[in-house]
Amino acid sequence: MAIKRSSKATSSQAASIKQIVKRCSSLRKMKNVNGCYYNQEDDLPQDVPKGHFPVYVGPNRSRYIVPISWLHHSEFQTLLRLAEEEFGFDHDMGLTIPCDEVFFRSLISMFR
């Protein structure tokens, strides 16, 4: 699967990313979701540092904590669009990235 790299995100891409982040941040408040404990007051997993968010990758749903800055990478934006197409964002499964875990690790190694 080839992912095209662009130097700048268009304003429509930025708007889409903001919408995705907004949807993800409005997940229901629950005590324990997918083995992750949430603080009922601020709706954030207690083990996720500020400026990061969890994603679940592959058929085994391996959990990764990724920095918000990755939202600016066109490759990561492509994965988010694939996630929206395959799963939508109105479910209790957390943000699930529909790709092979080996591919995801390879991709994120370029971001570091």
From Swiss-Prot:
Its main location: membrane. Pfam families: Auxin_inducible. GO terms for cellular component: plasma membrane. Keywords: Cell membrane, Developmental protein, Growth regulation, Membrane. Transmembrane segments: none annotated. Confined to the veins and petioles of rosette leaves and cauline leaves, and specifically expressed at the abaxial side of inflorescence branche; relocates to both the adaxial (Ad) and abaxial (Ab) sides of the branch in reduced red:far-red (R:FR) light, during shade. Also present in flowers. Induction: Induced by auxin (e.g. 2,4D). Up-regulated by brassinosteroids (e.g. brassinolide). Highly induced by a synergistic combination of auxin (e.g. IAA) and brassinolide. Accumulates in response to reduced red:far-red (R:FR) light, during shade; this light response can be attenuated by AGL8/FUL in the stem. Repressed by AGL8/FUL in stems and inflorescence branches. Accumulates in reduced red/far-red light ration (R:FR) conditions mimicking shaded conditions. InterPro entries: SAUR_fam. It is a peripheral membrane protein. It is found in: Cell membrane. GO terms for biological process: developmental growth involved in morphogenesis; regulation of unidimensional cell growth; response to auxin; response to brassinosteroid; response to low fluence red light stimulus; response to red or far red light; shade avoidance. Belongs to the ARG7 family. Provide a mechanistic link between auxin and plasma membrane H(+)-ATPases (PM H(+)-ATPases, e.g. AHA1 and AHA2), and triggers PM H(+)-ATPases activity by promoting phosphorylation of their C-terminal autoinhibitory domain as a result of PP2C-D subfamily of type 2C phosphatases inhibition, thus leading to the acidification of the apoplast and the facilitation of solutes and water uptake to drive cell expansion. Triggers plant growth probably by promoting cell elongation. Regulates branch angles and bending. This is Protein SMALL AUXIN UP-REGULATED RNA 10. The lineage of its organism: Eukaryota, Viridiplantae, Streptophyta, Embryophyta, Tracheophyta.
